[in-house]
Regions:
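Terminal accessory carbohydrate-recognition/targeting modules of carbohydrate-active enzymes
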Residues: 1-196
Length: 196
């Protein structure tokens, strides 16, 4: 399944864009926690994401949201200056597949979109922490790349239907906070790895 908030800021440890059973299917695992989208125009970057870190929300891309619709598929429309971008998310249950379609509705000059996935590869009841065992490497796949942080997990494929350049730059981001977990008195800080 896919589960997050309307502004795509995870507040629970079981939130994620790719949460699925592995092995015997009794437990769900968060593979893809979230995805940062950045609109680039005139060499300026506008990150559409919002994340909570200790004492701060950063980036604050929620301010660019102009519309949200839940049906027929979750759809968010962003406006950044002269750029209007629509994001539609469709979960294909039987295939354990998430499709995200970006449509550039309006732009007055050349515009690029940069995507940065944040990976957890963990049981949905646990939290991920930076470690030296995670494999941040990516491998070429048709239309994109595949990665797997730990050997016992399935490959996660990230593919596009357009020509795209993947820049490998594996790195840990520290102390993502999940507000609802904190409110309930549970552990609420997590580190996530981005492959690039």
């Amino acid at each position: 399944y896919m589960s997050t908030t309307i502004v795509c800021c995870n507040t629970r440890k079981y939130h994620g864009l790719m949460v699925c059973p592995i092995g015997d299917g009794e437990q769900n695992y968060v593979l893809l926690s979230n995805l940062d989208e950045t609109v680039i125009q005139h060499d300026q970057s506008f990150n559409l994401a919002i994340r909570r870190f200790p004492g701060i929300y950063e980036p604050r891309g929620h301010k660019y949201i102009t519309d949200f619709a839940y049906t027929p598929t979750p759809t968010i429309t962003y406006r950044v200056g002269g750029v209007v971008l629509r994001k539609e998310m469709l979960w294909i249950h039987r295939r354990t597949q998430l499709l995200i379609r970006y449509t550039l509705l309006d732009a007055h000059s050349p515009t690029r979109l940069r995507l940065r996935p944040f990976l957890a590869f963990r049981n949905m009841h646990e939290l991920s922490h930076a470690n030296m065992f995670a494999d941040g490497r990516t491998y070429a796949a048709a239309g994109g790349v595949r990665c797997r942080l730990y050997e016992d997990f399935p490959w996660l494929y990230m593919q596009t239907n357009r020509d795209a350049e993947f820049v490998a730059a594996p790195d840990w981001y520290y102390n993502f906070e999940y507000a609802e977990e904190a409110r309930r008195g549970y552990p609420f800080r997590e580190d996530l790895l981005t492959p690039g």
